[in-house]
From Swiss-Prot:
Gene name per UniProt: mrpl54
Keyword Aminoacyl-tRNA synthetase applies: no
Gene Ontology CC annotation, any one: mitochondrial large ribosomal subunit
InterPro entries in the cross-refs: Ribosomal_mL54 (IPR013870)
Natural source organism: Danio rerio
Keyword annotations from UniProtKB, A to Z: Mitochondrion, Ribonucleoprotein, Ribosomal protein, Transit peptide
Protein name from the UniProt record: Large ribosomal subunit protein mL54
Localization terms from the record: Mitochondrion
Amino acid sequence: MAHTVLQPFKRINLPVLNAYNNLFCNTFLVQTRSYAKKPVFKGKGKGMVKEVLKGPEVCKDPAKLCTYAVGVNVFKQGEDPTIKPKDEYPEWLFQLNLGPVKQLNELEPDSWEYWRRIRKEHIWRHNKLNKGKKM
């Protein structure tokens, strides 16, 4: 039974004297790895350059940029949503901080943003200290 179980793993044909020898030899064989194929380049020569991928086209039409939210539609079909007047959007949308992140001394000590920033800075410091240590 051991011979039939180990038969698919046999890589080298060795002379076999008995079943014990067959079992003993098959357990110490090294398995081979089959790596993925290297990419094949089109054309001749060693220094061929891979094909450069192109990004999405950028819309430069000013009329369309002023009336539609270009690039917001993530579906293949359909078109971009139209831009509505300001009074149709909620007020909190215009109060969002889109600039650089506030520093720790600019935040109020009792806000959750302050404590979240403290936790982040502690994690950054901890990671920086443990960067050079080996396990």
